[in-house]
Structures are given as C-alpha cells and as structure tokens.
Amino acid sequence: MTDRIPRSEVVKWLERLEKKLDSVEAKSKGGADALRNAEAYRDDCKHWLKQENLFLAFEACVYSWAIVETAENLGEII
C-alpha cells in the first residue's frame, strides 16, 4: 500500500474539474455561491499541487467536484 497519490492522478482530476467548471453556470444565488466555493477549492488544489502536497491537492479537488455535483443535482447550476 502506498500513502502517496500520484501527481498524474491529481493533474488528471484537476483538468476534468477545470472543464466542468468552464461548462456550468449558476441558475440562482445559491448556485453562484456554490460555484464560488468550488472555484476556491480548485484554487486550493492548484496551490497544494505547486507545494507538492499531493494529498491536500487531491482532497481539495474532490471537495470542489463534490460541490459542483451537489449543486448540479439540486438544480442550482446547469
């Protein structure tokens, strides 16, 4: 078992997240707030990636993705 997340895995999911964030828009104030939070976690991911803290980078990416999917499922973003 390894305790490291491969950099390539973080980059892969960050790229997918970037595409997703570029393709959605808010339908409400709640949706706009959700997107702002998702973008903040995306930015955190980039920061931790530069710092080579792959665990925190991946965690921030996952949080961002979860916010986007939740807002999408609630109909707050399209």
What function would you assign to each model-found segment?
Residues 1-35:
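Amphipathic, heptad-repeat alpha-helical segments
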